[in-house]
Amino acid sequence: SGTVDARCFGVFGPDVPADDALDALMADGSVTRIVFGTDVNFTRRHTFTRGHVTLDFTGHTVTAQGVEHAKHNDPFGALFHFTGVPGDDVRTFPLAQPMRELYDVFEVPGAGGIPLYSWWQVSVNSLAGREEKEIDKLLCVTERIDESHVRVNYKMGWPLDAGRVMTWRRVEPIERVCVQDMEFRGNEGGEETGAQPLAFEYAVRCDVRDVRARHTYWPVLLRRHNTEYVTERCSLANPIEVVVGGTGYLTQQIHCLYGKVRDCTTSNARHL
């Protein structure tokens, strides 16, 4: 329990893939810090829904030699994809009243029964295109006002007219993950063999520090529906693709709130 070194599971270098050891440690909720004391290689793309854990690579190199092929056009097919779980409680409804800009009280049916501090993906119907929405964020309910209104941890950035269709979906986010101190080396080639270390979805307070990457395909760190996080002292040099849409980034942040990106650099890349 507590802190466990992956060498206890027979991982003494990149010759033996570290996938099974990582899966076993992540499956044990009593392990809160996983330490890698040697260079390591992974051959599978992992998805985790468990939080409250730190992955510390202690400055060693992470590779993905022989990794399983990625799905087409799937930037979330990282080596480590941490994700919360969307629930079955979905509420779709037209606004009965206009919503004011810079207002944190939101209309929602059955508000009196919504648990305090529960998390919801809150979005509005698009008026043009698919993603042109005034809101699509992961929000926390901080107060029940009455049977049809709650307060959330966000002040609305645009006014909405009555009749606009809102969708609230309950989410159990992944919380308090930290990945740190990694030298990542991706693969040459294209999308199938391309590799990148990290993706976070429906994530709260999930931080990344001191990840230095080269030769990635999709963003080194992809975030969607994240909030209250820090990305710091990370870098990317020489990604293998910068022309295809979405490639060649150090970090991409979609529908995110309250994040800090600081002391990060890129060289010969598409974007920070």
Predicted regions and their residues:
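Extracellular beta-strand-rich, repetitive "passenger/adhesive" scaffolds
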Residues: S1-T3, V11, D28-D39, F57-T63, ...
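Right-handed parallel beta-helix
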Residues: T58-G59, E175-G186, V204-H215, N226-E241, ...
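Short glycine/acidic-rich loop motifs that flank beta-strands on beta-rich extracellular proteins
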Residues: R44-H46, A64-E68, E188-Q196, T216-L222, ...
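Extracellular beta-strand solenoid repeats
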Residues: D5, V35, N41, T47, ...
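Acidic Gly/Asp/Thr-rich repetitive segments characteristic of extracellular carbohydrate-active
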Residues: A6-G37, N41, G110-P115
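Parallel beta-helix/beta-solenoid
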Residues: T58, L79-E101, G112-V124, E172-E188, ...
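N-terminal extracellular ligand-recognition/capping segment immediately after the signal peptide
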Residues: D23, S30-F76, V124-K137, Y154-R164, ...
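Ser/Thr/Gly-rich low-complexity blocks that favor extended beta-strand/coil architectures
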Residues: R91-L95, M99-P159
